[in-house]
UniProtKB/Swiss-Prot annotation:
Belongs to the universal ribosomal protein uS12 family. One of its GO terms (biological process) is translation. The modification 3-methylthioaspartic acid is found at D89. This is Small ribosomal subunit protein uS12. The keyword RNA-binding applies. The lineage of its organism: Bacteria, Pseudomonadati, Pseudomonadota, Betaproteobacteria, Burkholderiales. With S4 and S5 plays an important role in translational accuracy. Interacts with and stabilizes bases of the 16S rRNA that are involved in tRNA selection in the A site and with the mRNA backbone. Located at the interface of the 30S and 50S subunits, it traverses the body of the 30S subunit contacting proteins on the other side and probably holding the rRNA structure together. The combined cluster of proteins S8, S12 and S17 appears to hold together the shoulder and platform of the 30S subunit. GO terms for cellular component: small ribosomal subunit. InterPro entries: NA-bd_OB-fold, Ribosomal_uS12, Ribosomal_uS12_bac. Pfam families: Ribosom_S12_S23 (PF00164). The gene is rpsL. One of its GO terms (molecular function) is structural constituent of ribosome. Keywords: Methylation, Ribonucleoprotein, Ribosomal protein, RNA-binding, rRNA-binding, tRNA-binding. Part of the 30S ribosomal subunit. Contacts proteins S8 and S17. May interact with IF1 in the 30S initiation complex.
Length: 125
């Protein structure tokens, strides 16, 4: 424990807050190009084939991002919008791809939580 004199001379160092999505560089979203689209398996105890894409962002960094929703139309060289937000059961996936913007279409026949999946309001019959 420091003495009062040591604190007067040096002071306390403020702990820096570490970003959870460093590749975004303090932007809300970033545009990028898909370099690889593939599926991967989650860690225990979950079991599935999660859709992910490796994306090269406009700032040059390459990140792995998650494609939410059922079905997608992404291929290599698709231009996508990436936002922060990790996927708990996929290690290394710290970003999400925004549905319904740029080359990625919204989820088809989505009725609830549509804004999260870029789905238009269905026509009332």
């Amino acid at each position: 424990m420091p003495t009062i004199n040591q604190l007067v001379r040096q002071g306390r160092e403020v702990e820096k807050i570490k970003s959870k999505s460093p590749a975004m560089e303090n932007s809300p979203q970033r545009r990028g190009v898909c370099t690889r689209v593939y599926t991967t398996t989650p860690k225990k105890p979950n079991s599935a084939l999660r859709k992910v894409a490796k994306v090269r962002l406009t700032n040059g960094s390459e990140v792995i991002s998650y494609i939410g929703g059922e079905g997608h139309n992404l291929q290599e060289h698709s231009v996508v919008l990436v936002r922060g937000g990790r996927v708990k059961d996929l290690p290394g996936v710290r970003y999400h791809i925004v549905r319904g913007s740029l080359d990625l279409q919204g989820v088809k026949d989505r009725k609830q939580a549509r804004s999260k999946y870029g789905a238009k309001k269905p026509k009332a019959k």
